[in-house]
Curated annotation (Swiss-Prot):
Pfam families: H2O2_YaaD. It comes from the Bacteria. GO terms for biological process: response to hydroperoxide. Belongs to the UPF0246 family. GO terms for cellular component: cytosol. This is UPF0246 protein ABO_1338.
């Protein structure tokens, strides 16, 4: 199985890192083209385009300005250790041993508006450029047009290298829209996480994001290869709900937390 998740807005470039053998993102020429376009934006443009505060807009204008190749351990950080949102709280990459990190490097991918596809140990310079951003560019009106088939083709290559024909989508709709579903060389499984609230089960964003990270870590640490065994996921109080599930859309539910 190859797992895909969304990136996070919150970044950590401060905390101590273990000794890691890092890799380079594989689509940096594309990233460089996007950076050149983003550098044409004023902080006011960024604020309007991304719907962010002036402070965040200025920070990201500075990030675009400072972005430079080559990436090294002084100016960049391994992607899975840099992202710090809810998905990554669930993932808890710091708890992975060397074998598990190696497994993640082969089977875990982060989609990115700037970098396209990232492996856990790919070095990444700080940025904010969400996939849904309507940034017109040399290839079209937005980032979906910019990335075209590139992301899908790289995921297909990664699936082939990992000897799997199953893609587990743990990303948001905004990000997975960058994947051409009909061109994926295999089966797409899209787990759903629902929490009980006032007697009803529904997707609660904060919990669902964390659950996606929990499932990704669970798959990697167990070395799971058979997608049929995804139904055994039972972390943090979630359990498989057969009545609500289909083979390609397994549903996991958790009773209301006391």
């Amino acid at each position: 199985m190859l797992i895909v998740v969304s990136p996070a807005k919150t970044l950590d470039y401060e905390s101590e890192l273990p000794a890691l053998k890092t890799t380079q993102p594989r689509l940096l020429d594309d990233s460089e083209a996007l950076i050149a376009r983003a550098r044409q934006l004023s902080p006011a443009d960024i604020s309007s385009l991304m719907g962010v505060s002036d402070k965040i807009a200025h920070l990201n204008a500075e990030r675009f300005s400072l972005w430079e190749r080559p990436f090294n351990k002084k100016n960049a950080r391994p992607a899975a250790f840099a992202f710090k949102g809810d998905v990554y709280t669930g993932l808890d990459i710091e708890s992975f041993n060397d074998h598990q990190l190696s497994e993640a490097q082969q089977r875990f991918r982060m989609l990115s508006g700037l970098y396209g596809v990232l492996r856990p140990l790919d070095l990444m310079q700080a940025y904010r450029l969400e996939m849904g951003t309507k940034l017109d560019n040399e290839r079209g009106k937005d980032l979906y047009a910019f990335w075209g088939n590139t992301i899908t083709e790289l995921l297909n290559k990664d699936m082939k290298d990992a000897k799997t024909d199953v893609l587990v989508n743990l990303a948001s709709n905004e990000y997975f829209k960058a994947v051409k579903k009909k061109a994926v060389a295999g089966t797409i499984i899209e787990p759903v996480f629902q929490d009980e609230k006032n007697g009803n089960y529904k997707i609660i964003s904060f919990y669902a994001k964390k659950a996606r990270g929990l499932m990704a870590a669970w798959i990697i640490k167990k070395g799971l290869k058979d997608p049929a065994k995804l139904t055994q996921f039972d972390v943090a109080g979630y359990c498989y709900c057969e009545a609500q599930s289909t083979a390609l859309r397994p549903v996991f539910r958790r009773p209301e937390q006391g």
